[in-house]
């Protein structure tokens, strides 16, 4: 075991509750980062969302509603569900994607696929069409933009203010 570790905030909670892992009594006395994640989408998904937008394209609610329309059209046409990458099931990335999607009426468990990817694989997975979008921290969103394979749709700070990402976890 460890005395202290840098963890995704939800991992600390999940570990202390025994979710997905052996129960480890830990606490997280320090927050190490806020609001560093972003949602990046492929050029094709960006164009599809923008074609369905009704309102401000920088408003997370407007894009979530547009995403719901894109998802519905894809379902009606028989297309495969959109695939979204995130870093870990017990991560703010996962919860932030779910929160944003659900706000627009997209059921993250039924309407899309959520897959776990290590952050360094996100950009290649987007470029190769393995995912249509991802939620991750720096520098991967900017890398996708610099390479021309992605558009940053939202910074998570636009969706959830003061979203804790990383914590210092210690054994109780």
Annotated model-derived regions:
Residues 1-109, 115, 128-163:
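Short, glycine-/small- and polar/acidic-enriched structural segments
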Residues 121-122:
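Short acidic active-site motifs
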Residues 163-172:
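A conserved active-site cap/scaffold subdomain adjacent to cofactor or substrate pockets
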